[in-house]
């Protein structure tokens, strides 16, 4: 992300610079149109599809919970409209954090262009990872994921979700979709775009896969685990920009990164390879959302393993690069010995002149003049 220079002149309407400077205001107006649509009966039915979660199912109260009935949700095609609206919300929040927090810090710290771009990236991602990690942990605790790990595969397919779980997934999809237009809004360098596209695409692929295959329990646990490790990395990088001697956070992150990859593989194999493989119902059924067949299980495990291997490969390259930079910084400079020339002509040239500059020769030195006078 390049530094945005503010100019006193107003750019032409709907020009490239106009869209970059005012994209948050334009998106805010679009979001307000959906909210205003809720106020009128004619447009309320269409607007509510974008704003509220769809596919609500009311489960009647059981004997254990006779006081109230449970409202659960499943997914459908209308979720695309909801994701679109909250993608607009994510763009607005992104602009607020950028203008009122990160830009003010950048003006105080006077970062270079490279550090400015990385600082903005880590600032935005650390805020998102912290929020998503806290929210996901709250869901895990409230729905007894921690006290009963078998909930990851028991009673599959998990085609019904609580409001918090579905809203969490909708928000995740909306956030990572908003990252595509942000590449344009933040003037991302061309050489950084392929890396960003791979990064965003992997998130969308795995989040959408867990959501559509009704593996939302496993996906939620893995996301919280991954987000915590990523939050530690980006918050450490923010501290590093203010003090380049800061290395403790990176050391802790390196350990937790490896442990996170290991835990991800263990939980995935335990859930998909053992838990779902021993389930009684192993027939493909789109109506009930049951995808517990051998081909799907192999595809899920393969995608997770390949992604973890790719992340470890990037991690090892990153650590090797840091180690080389640290070694080069710590290595003492090599002292060059002056070359000793042989022969009378070289000695005479050295005495009488160096690089064309005339110097005093041996006969004119104070010591030799003293010997002659004696």
From Swiss-Prot:
Alphabetized UniProt keyword annotations: Endoplasmic reticulum, Glycoprotein, Membrane, Phosphoprotein, Protein transport, Translocation, Transmembrane, Transmembrane helix, Transport
PROSITE patterns: TLC
Any one of the GO BP annotations: SRP-dependent cotranslational protein targeting to membrane, translocation
Processing and modification events after translation: N-glycosylated.
Cytoplasmic domain ranges by topology: 1-29, 98-121, 181-192, 239-251, 319-374
Keyword Cytoplasm: no
Alphabetical list of InterPro entries matching this protein: TLC-dom, Translocation_assoc_membrane
Ranges that cross the membrane: 30-50, 77-97, 122-142, 160-180, 193-213, 218-238, 252-272, 298-318
Record note on what altering residue 56 to Q does: Abolishes glycosylation
Similarity comment text for this entry: Belongs to the TRAM family.
PANTHER family per the UniProt record, alphabetical: TRANSLOCATING CHAIN-ASSOCIATED MEMBRANE PROTEIN 1 (PTHR12371:SF3), TRANSLOCATION ASSOCIATED MEMBRANE PROTEIN (PTHR12371)
The protein, known as: Translocating chain-associated membrane protein 1
């Amino acid at each position: 992300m390049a530094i945005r220079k503010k100019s006193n002149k107003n750019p032409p309407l709907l020009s490239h610079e106009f869209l970059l400077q005012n994209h948050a205001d334009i998106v805010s107006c679009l979001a307000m149109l959906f909210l205003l649509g809720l106020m009128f009966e004619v447009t309320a039915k269409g607007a509510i599809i974008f704003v509220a979660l769809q596919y609500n199912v009311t489960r009647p109260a059981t004997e254990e919970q006779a006081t109230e009935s449970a409202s659960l949700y499943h997914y459908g095609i209308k979720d695309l409209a909801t994701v679109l609206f909250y993608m607009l919300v994510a763009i607005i929040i992104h602009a607020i954090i950028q203008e009122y927090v990160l830009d003010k810090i950048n003006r105080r710290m006077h970062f270079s262009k490279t550090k400015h771009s990385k600082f903005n990236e880590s600032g935005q991602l650390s805020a998102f990872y912290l929020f998503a990690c806290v929210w996901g942990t709250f869901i895990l605790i409230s729905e007894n994921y921690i006290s009963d790990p078998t909930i990851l595969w028991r009673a599959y397919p998990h085609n019904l979700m609580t409001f918090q779980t579905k809203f969490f997934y909708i928000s995740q999809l909306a956030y990572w979709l908003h990252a595509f237009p942000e590449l344009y809004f933040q003037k991302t360098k061309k050489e950084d775009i392929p890396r960003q596209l791979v990064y965003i695409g992997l998130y969308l692929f795995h989040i959408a896969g867990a959501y559509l295959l009704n593996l939302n329990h496993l996906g939620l646990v893995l996301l919280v685990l991954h987000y915590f490790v990523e939050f530690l990395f980006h918050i450490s990088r923010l501290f590093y920009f203010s003090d380049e001697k800061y290395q403790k956070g990176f050391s802790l992150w390196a350990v937790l990164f490896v442990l996170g990859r290991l835990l991800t593989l263990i939980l995935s194999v335990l859930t998909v390879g053992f838990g779902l493989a021993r389930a009684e119902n192993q027939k493909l059924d789109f109506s009930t959302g049951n995808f517990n067949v051998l081909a799907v299980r192999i595809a899920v495990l393969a995608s997770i393993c390949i992604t973890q291997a790719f992340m470890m490969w990037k991690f090892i390259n990153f650590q090797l690069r840091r180690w080389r930079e640290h070694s080069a910084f710590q290595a003492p400079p090599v002292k060059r010995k002056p070359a000793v020339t042989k022969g009378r002509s070289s000695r005479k040239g050295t005495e009488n002149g160096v690089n064309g500059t005339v110097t005093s020769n041996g006969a004119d030195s104070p010591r030799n003049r003293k010997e002659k006078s004696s």
